[in-house]
Amino acid sequence: MRLVVARCEVRYSGRLSAVLPEALRLLMFKSDGSVMVHSDTGGYKPENWMTAPTVIEESDDEIVVRKLGGEDRLDIRLAEIVS
């Protein structure tokens, strides 16, 4: 499991579309390929997530998570990695 605390913007596209504006978030990448995006407010439920199986692509300022066998996609644009 990998935990990242970052100031980031998250865009989901697929069955629906959603944009989470830039804010401080906890990104959780689990060993099964699932990904969860949490904020400091709003309780225990993630603001966005992607269930396994996924493909995760990383660059210096962006993480792209794609659902295998589907069109669902999370684009996480990193402004600052805190930890």
Located regions from the model:
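Acidic, aromatic-enriched beta-alpha/helix-loop junctions
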Residues: A23-V64
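Surface-exposed beta-loop interaction hotspot
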Residues: L68-S83
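Short Lys/Arg-enriched alpha/beta "domain-start" segment
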Residues: M1-S34
